[in-house]
Amino acid sequence: MSKLEGKVAVVTGASKGIGAAIAKALAKDGAAVVVNYASSKAGADAVVEAITAAGGKAIAVQADVSQAVQARGLVEAAVQQFGRLDVLVNNSGVYEFAAIEEVTEEHYRRIFDVNVLGVLLATQAASKHLGEGGSIINISSVVTDVLMPTSAVYSGTKGALNAISGVLANELAPRKIRVNVVSPGYVVTEGTHTAGIAGSEMEAGLVAQTPLGRSGQPDDIAGVVAFLASDDARWVTGEVINASGGVR
């Protein structure tokens, strides 16, 4: 029997990159997966198609999780389609860097709304349906430890996420719901290609600082998330796990 057979997972921001890899990994382990997207319907549909072609179950649901009504609608769609909810992966995130002289109110609010408020709202909605053995996994970043110039706002969101996750781990523990964090290091995704990082001197520098000597891949993160979603991690809660090739 697959590790997640009979379970239902919602993965936010799952139309590409790390989120897409997580959705596919959970489905491979037997979960029915709700592939959330904010705007990239084609990407989400492609993830669903890949999952169903491999014999899994998945649907795509559009929602901006920084909006309470939409976050609730996402969770309700999962329960309506599959009858339950067992796993929430808060992967949606915005990463934009700016020097302190260039930070604006709009920049700050946009990033905090998705990276922090979105996690709170999705978790609030999901917590009403998660039962004993439920698992919440929040995707953070090693920028909370590796203090990069121009990342003040982004790093601030991930520091807040780590703190919130610790609080929620204690708050939801009486209900036997686990809350953990996965903090990726540098991972090659569509976003790093769009930003011009992949194949650049910056990427070479990041790899040089990585003890395992290579860039991360989305599947490197997905495997850790799949473990935390499963009953193999039943005694693990309140943890921040760096999946960074040794960067800390």
From Swiss-Prot:
UniProt-annotated catalytic positions: Y154
Keyword S-adenosyl-L-methionine: no
SUPFAM superfamilies for this protein: NAD(P)-binding Rossmann-fold domains
Lineage: superkingdom: Bacteria
GO molecular function: oxidoreductase activity
Top EC class for this record: oxidoreductase
Keyword terms: Oxidoreductase
PROSITE patterns according to UniProt: ADH_SHORT
CDD domains the record matches: THN_reductase-like_SDR_c
Binding locations of substrate: S141
Pfam families: adh_short_C2
Its EC number(s): 1.-.-.-
Keyword Kinase: no
Family: Belongs to the short-chain dehydrogenases/reductases (SDR) family.
NCBIfam families: PRK07231.1 (NF005559)
Entry protein name: Uncharacterized oxidoreductase MexAM1_META1p0182
